[in-house]
Regions:
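N-terminal glycine-/serine-/threonine-rich phosphate-binding loop
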Residues: 1-45, 54-65, 178-183
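Short beta-strand segments at enzyme active-site cores
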Residues: 6-8, 41-54, 106-111, 186-189, ...
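Short acidic, glycine/serine/threonine-rich loops at helix termini
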Residues: 17-19, 53-58, 119-125, 198-200, ...
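A glycine- and small-aliphatic-rich helix-loop capping segment at beta-alpha/alpha-beta transitions
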Residues: 21-26, 58-69, 124-132, 201-209, ...
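Polyanion-binding loop/helix "lid" in catalytic or ligand-binding cores
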Residues: 23-30, 74-98, 163-180, 186-195, ...
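Ligand-binding beta-strand-loop-alpha-helix segment within the catalytic cores
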Residues: 62-186
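Glycine-rich beta-alpha junction loops
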Residues: 111-118, 191-194, 235-237
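Acidic, metal-binding active-site segment of PIN/NYN-like and related structure-specific nucleases
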Residues: 222-244
Length: 291
């Protein structure tokens, strides 16, 4: 009998521009449809780190070109935009691959809002990398000119970081669950979900943040009662001593081993750390689950 699988695609694995993304989603669709053909149910989430950074940069440049006409675009709206265009490419690539193999199965992208706590300490200590990699000189200029927070990202360059609060709940979870139970292939929680928090009454207000897609995917996998959570990245495997002469790739880990490596500081915050933490949390959430 097939399993119910949540697949979390890394934003960096989707390419750095639209042509690269088109190629990446076609390759991804083939692998996902292989699983579907084997009888598994698949739900897809994805990151948006490079993409949301590009969107916000473009909107900021537009504002600077005519500040009397345009206003800066809130980060939550940039996340929504990224969900739309990444979901559009993924949805069409999956549909095409399914039809090419003679499989009649619907594909739907859900514009997904995820509730966060406005008092989350992540709003004070930003850790989520977004946008393109920069040299040290470029990063210093962004700090001076725009007041960005930046970090060195796992030896690959410098990036802007923004708040990344923990996901509390998925607003559209009932709709997602209904679609999955009806047999659709669902794309949800893109970019970790549009970050929102509750105000007076039933109003949801966008938050200036990007939720880590690994934690959001963990919540999604739990709430759709998945058997397996698969987190894909731009690197081959999880590693200890990453980027050092004694680097070691890891084929598998127990939750206790993972916690030990976390305590040793082996995994970079905002990069591999949330992936390992999300995998541990999901694997321990119910008997028989794996990540």
């Amino acid at each position: 009998m097939g399993k119910r699988i949540v697949i979390a695609l890394g934003g960096n694995a989707l390419g750095n521009n639209l042509p690269e993304q088109m190629i990446a989603v076609k390759q991804t669709a083939r692998a996902i449809v292989d699983l579907i053909q084997e009888g598994h149910q698949v739900i897809i989430a994805h990151g948006n780190g490079p993409q949301v950074g590009m969107i916000q940069k473009a909107m900021a440049e537009l504002t600077r070109s005519d500040p009397d006409k345009y206003i800066p675009c809130p980060l939550s709206v940039c996340v929504a935009m990224s969900q739309g265009y990444i979901g559009y490419d993924l949805q069409n690539a999956l549909r095409e691959e399914l039809l090419d193999r003679g499989i009649s199965k619907g594909v739907a992208t859900v514009l997904t809002q995820v509730e966060v706590d406005p008092a989350d300490p992540a709003f004070i200590h930003p850790t989520k990398p977004i946008g393109a990699f920069m040299t040290r000189e470029e990063a210093d200029r962004m700090v001076a000119e725009r007041g960005y927070d930046v970090i060195e990202d796992a030896g690959r360059g410098w990036r802007r970081v923004v708040a990344s609060p923990q996901p509390v709940s998925i607003i559209e979870i009932e709709s997602i669950r209904d679609m999955v139970n009806a047999g659709l292939v669902v794309v949800a929680c893109g970019g970790g979900g549009i970050p929102v928090y509750k105000t007076e009454g039933h109003h949801l207000k966008g938050a200036a943040a990007v939720i880590d897609k690994d934690f959001a995917s963990c919540v999604l996998a739990q709430q759709v009662e998945a058997d397996t959570l698969i987190i894909l990245t731009a690197v081959e495997k999880v590693a200890v001593n990453f980027g050092k002469p004694d680097q070691k790739w890891l084929d598998e880990l127990t939750p206790d081993q993972a916690r030990q490596y976390i305590a040793e500081g082996q995994f970079a915050p905002g990069s591999m750390l949330p992936k390992v933490e999300a995998a541990v949390k999901f694997a321990e959430s119910a008997p028989g689950r794996s990540a």
